[in-house]
Amino acid sequence: MESWLTSFITQSLVYSLLVVGIVSFLESLALVGLLLPGIILMTTLGTFIGDGKLSFYPAWISGTTGCLLGDWISYYIGLYFKNWLYNFNFLKKNQKLLDKTKSFLDKHSMLTIILGRFIGPTRPLIPMVSGMLKLPLKKFVFPSIIGCILWPPVYFFPGIVTGIAIKIPESSQSYYFKWLLLLISILIWLGIWLISKWWKMRKNHIDNRTSFFTKKKIGWLAILTMSSGILSLIAIQFHPTMLIFREIFSTILLGT
């Protein structure tokens, strides 16, 4: 998949943006998005941005457009094919996930639509379920736009960092810098995952006291992991190679 993306993206800017739009669209499309490795595809596209093969702002616009199309088509699929979807085998097997999504939409529709955009399994489900619940369009459209604007750069970011790291000239200093950058990325992403895990356990009143990883331990582990990631991120700012990293990063953001 990655080699196909590479060859297609290097053909022309139009093809590149078409790939970003299609990936974002399929990632957001009802049920289809569940079958795609979203973070891998978007991170790969982010790598092309960091490496200079793809422009950041056109990719962002293309990603947002594809995301909105996927969201709104999914909403109408849920609205007009509700009865068929309830009898669909895949949804029957994942009834628990469907029920949780419904519950969150009933209680906090706006927050659920925005935050659900960043969670793999719920991303292609929430717009469809919003339609199935006949959520008023005015309650769906605004958070959908916000989520679709924020989602592409967040999912591109790990790839952008990787692409910049590849672009940094080889030296003994840059070698250690790249490994530090990878470690920091892992710590921060792991910290975010642990926080979301702890939050789910807290919301659902789950505490596996028989398991080694209790809610309390996961909470402390989340704090330690996230703190280590943030402190390491602060410390790496003083590394000599960070000047080169900032220069490349600002070039990407400024589009120069």
From Swiss-Prot:
Main subcellular localisation: membrane
Organism the protein comes from: Buchnera aphidicola subsp. Acyrthosiphon pisum (strain APS) (Acyrthosiphon pisum symbiotic bacterium)
GO annotations of cellular component type: plasma membrane
PANTHER family to which the protein is assigned, alphabetical: INNER MEMBRANE PROTEIN DEDA-RELATED (PTHR30353), INNER MEMBRANE PROTEIN YABI (PTHR30353:SF15)
Name the UniProt record assigns to this protein: Uncharacterized membrane protein BU139
A Pfam family per the record: VTT_dom
Transmembrane domains' residue ranges: 6-26, 29-49, 61-81, 145-165, 175-195, 218-238
Record's bilayer topology term: Multi-pass membrane protein
